[in-house]
């Protein structure tokens, strides 16, 4: 991939990372930039997973590097602390694009070699027949269209809506996808193991995703050194790399947690073996293989699933059957494995996108030679993705980041409370030095020692009784009718979870318009708050407990 194209790709990815204003899930802040901010600046809230040692500090430590550099140089301004992770994420996305291009280029080389062989066979043939005229027609129809898998795959990667929408966010899933792509390109066993170890340090499930590739390296080793020696080399090298990577991760986690903890095992036990992640939402087994695959790959998935047909009918294409079927196999294995876990999110299978797009590019190049309809379909699909990037990246659910932009550009606030559902907005990493104290509805999970199930949280109480929660938290009173048995039960439930007057009245409050209407008379106006600004969150709301508008209220000082 030429350097000028890499530079343009990075500029495009940086533009997306810096301008996209919508939100997807709280983990894009609270498992990355907020943890990194806490590591460097010693301030902020850590989600409950970090209390139980479920996550390795490896990924947040990578994010913390630009924070530490800014702090060391004394350049940690509000804007710089916000912008630095965007540069890092743009670099990760660009490397994914480069990997997509390189893997596509490998297919190009194999196809070009095979086509040269076929052309030579035809020239040497005395009776050319129908195949000769077909080859002439194909060569002519290739004029004026892109017949490069690498460039087509890059185009699909740059235009894919979910790659732009999710890839700009600092999820561990995105850098995991990069490491998986790099791993797939390794022919030597040691680099393969090292990259697999790094991917597993970020998300332990990567080890399961990449496990089928071990058999490929085992086959190569036994072919080169014999079965016994080859197996011995594979096992011994694997153990050495495993101890090195796992030991390094444990030392890094010890520095953060202050105790020895095997985070991959804790994560795997909690989310996979005990399946406790199901309390954050459950989906049917076909969720990934049905709506998610179609959703994240987009309409180009039609070309992806057509790859076996192309390999079967096109003689020249069989030269790339192993890598193409390998990518399809890894994608299917990934979807199948994650389908066994009840808690499912689209970003968990982010790595499937580049693999699917490379395969789709292969089909596009082969079919576009003889079909103008395929070329038009591709253009239409790319246009669809561009529209989706705009809607999902700049329109749908943009309220929280608009609030953060307002805080970054506004005067310093002593105390800002976000009265909304769990982790609706980012923390200090998005408003460095602009807010002295950030308060929010606590949703830290505490497991019951007897049942092993999560206890009721403040967030649950807020969802059930938003007005009463605010009155009880700040004023130590509620409006439940204690003479009514059901109302009395609700009051007791609230009092058992939320401490009365547990927070002072903040200088500013952020909440949905629906909550503001409910507490405007009994709380906001009573304590001298006025509406500062209303932010459009989304033209329509599909998620529960959301609203079309988010409002900021400020306390008027007399």
UniProtKB/Swiss-Prot annotation:
Molecular-function annotations in GO: alpha-1,2-mannosyltransferase activity; mannosyltransferase activity
What's the short name of a Pfam family annotated to this entry?
Glyco_transf_22
Q: In which pathway does it act?
A: Glycolipid biosynthesis; glycosylphosphatidylinositol-anchor biosynthesis
Q: Where in the cell is it found?
A: Endoplasmic reticulum membrane
Q: What is its EC number?
A: 2.4.1.-
Q: What is its main location?
A: endoplasmic reticulum
Q: Which UniProt keywords apply?
A: Endoplasmic reticulum, Glycoprotein, Glycosyltransferase, GPI-anchor biosynthesis, Membrane, Transferase, Transmembrane, Transmembrane helix
How does the record classify its membrane topology? Multi-pass membrane protein
Q: What does this protein do?
A: Mannosyltransferase involved in glycosylphosphatidylinositol-anchor biosynthesis. Transfers the third alpha-1,2-mannose to Man2-GlcN-acyl-PI during GPI precursor assembly.
What remark does the entry add? The protozoan parasite evades the immune response of mammalian hosts and digestion in the gut of the insect vector by means of its coat proteins tethered to the cell surface via GPI-anchors. GPI10 is essential for growth of mammalian stage bloodstream form, while procyclic form (insect stage parasites) are viable but grow slower, suggesting that inhibition of GPI synthesis may be an effective chemotherapy against African trypanosomiasis.
Protein name per UniProt: GPI mannosyltransferase 3
- Organism (species): Trypanosoma brucei brucei (strain 927/4 GUTat10.1)
Q: What is the lineage of its organism?
A: Eukaryota, Discoba, Euglenozoa, Kinetoplastea, Metakinetoplastina
């Amino acid at each position: 991939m030429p350097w000028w194209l890499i530079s343009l790709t990075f500029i495009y990815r940086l533009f997306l990372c810096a301008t996209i204003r919508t939100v997807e899930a709280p983990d894009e802040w609270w498992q990355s930039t907020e943890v990194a901010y806490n590591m460097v600046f010693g301030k902020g809230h850590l989600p409950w997973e970090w209390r139980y040692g479920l996550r390795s500090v490896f990924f947040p430590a990578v994010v913390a590097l630009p924070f530490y550099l800014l702090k060391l140089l004394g350049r940690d301004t509000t804007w710089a602390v916000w912008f630095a992770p965007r540069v890092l994420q743009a670099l990760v996305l660009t490397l994914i694009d480069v990997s997509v291009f390189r893997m596509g280029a490998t297919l190009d080389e194999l196809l070009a070699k095979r086509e040269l062989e076929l052309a030579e066979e035809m020239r040497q043939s005395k009776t050319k027949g129908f195949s000769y005229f077909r080859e002439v027609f194909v060569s002519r129809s290739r004029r004026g269209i892109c017949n490069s898998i690498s460039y087509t795959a890059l185009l699909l990667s740059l235009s894919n809506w979910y790659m732009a929408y999710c890839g700009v966010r600092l999820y561990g899933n995105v850098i995991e996808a990069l490491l998986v792509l790099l791993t797939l390109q390794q022919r030597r066993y040691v680099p393969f193991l090292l990259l697999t170890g790094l991917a597993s340090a970020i998300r332990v499930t990567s080890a399961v995703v990449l496990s089928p590739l071990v058999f490929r390296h085992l086959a190569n080793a036994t072919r080169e050194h014999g079965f016994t020696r080859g197996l011995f080399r594979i096992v011994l090298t694997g153990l050495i790399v495993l101890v090195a990577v796992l030991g390094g991760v444990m030392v890094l986690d010890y520095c953060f947690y202050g105790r020895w903890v095997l985070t991959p095992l804790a994560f795997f036990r909690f989310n996979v073996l005990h399946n406790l992640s199901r309390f954050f939402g459950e989906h049917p087994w076909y969720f990934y293989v049905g709506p998610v695959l179609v959703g994240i790959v987009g309409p180009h998935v039609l070309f992806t699933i057509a790859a076996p047909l192309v390999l079967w009918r096109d003689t020249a294409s069989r030269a790339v059957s192993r890598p193409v079927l390998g990518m399809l196999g890894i994608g299917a294995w990934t979807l199948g494995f994650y389908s066994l876990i009840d808690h499912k999110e689209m970003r968990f299978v982010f790595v499937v996108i580049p693999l699917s797009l490379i395969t789709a590019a292969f089909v596009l190049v082969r079919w576009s030679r003889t079909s103008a309809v395929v070329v038009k379909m591709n253009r239409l699909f790319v246009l669809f993705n561009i529209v989706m990037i705009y809607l999902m990246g700049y329109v749908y659910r943009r309220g929280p980041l608009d609030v953060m932009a307002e805080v970054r550009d506004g005067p310093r606030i002593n105390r800002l409370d976000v009265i909304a559902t769990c982790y609706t907005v980012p923390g200090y990493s998005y408003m460095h030095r602009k807010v002295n104290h950030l308060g929010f509805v606590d949703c830290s999970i505490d497991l019951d020692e007897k049942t092993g199930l999560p206890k009721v949280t403040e967030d649950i109480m807020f969802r059930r009784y938003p007005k009463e929660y605010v009155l009880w938290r700040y004023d130590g009173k509620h409006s439940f009718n204690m003479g009514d048995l059901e109302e009395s039960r609700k009051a007791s439930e609230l009092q058992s979870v939320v401490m009365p007057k547990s927070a002072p009245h903040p200088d500013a409050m952020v909440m949905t318009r629906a909550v503001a209407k409910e507490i405007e008379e009994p709380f906001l106006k009573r304590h001298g708050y006025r509406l500062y600004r209303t932010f459009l969150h989304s033209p329509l709301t599909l998620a529960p407990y959301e609203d079309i508008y988010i409002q900021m209220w400020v306390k008027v000082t007399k």
